Amino acid sequence: MRCAASRVAGIVLAGLAAGALGPVAAFAAPTTPPAASGGTSAADLKSDGPTQPAKVQDGQYTDKNGDPTYHVTDSGKKVDWYTMSGYLRYNANCIVCHGPDGMGSTYAPSLVDALKGMDYAHFAGIIVGGKNDVNAAQELVMPAFGDNRNVMCYMPDIYTYLRARSDGALGRNRPPEHEPKPAAFEKAEDACMK
């Protein structure tokens, strides 16, 4: 099952990398992105939390493995656009089962805890194919969202937000500030939602 989920996640990742990455307008105040002036320095990539971005392209930060990651600064008060987008999409699609801020509920587990040992490919595999893990001790069942554009078009963003929460780089509640929405995000969002 894990191999099939990883293959599906790889296909999804390839599609997302080809242009389907973004989310919806946020209400927090936008601020200038660190790499807006052109080149990216090590100081531009410095982030709160244990996971440090290795690269930023079109406002999307990635770690050394190429997985989407957060750029949180100012003691958790300022986030990149994709983390903000993930917050918005999480609250539109995931909060019903997984509770506020990814903390879990009586109905579904904490995603803050689950992401501590989960890479993006595994996360994507569960989102695309769902989960059905039933045994005597527990019943973990999640529907597949592979055909839901409101989730699939924003999957990297949701992962980025939950990763920031899991790493302790972002606290509970809405981030007060965010970097501006990149033009590449809008283009990818439009292409994905068609």
Write out the residue ranges for each language-model feature.
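Flexible coil segments in periplasmic/lumen-exposed cytochrome c-class electron-transfer proteins
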Residues: 29-72, 80, 88, 137-194
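Secreted/luminal cysteine- and crosslink-motif detector
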Residues: 4, 95-98, 193
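Gly/Gly-Pro-rich "capping" loops immediately C-terminal to redox-active cysteine motifs
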Residues: 101-129, 144-148
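C-terminal segment of classical bacterial N-terminal signal peptides
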Residues: 16-26
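Sec/Tat-exported extracytoplasmic proteins
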Residues: 93-94, 98, 115, 130-134, ...
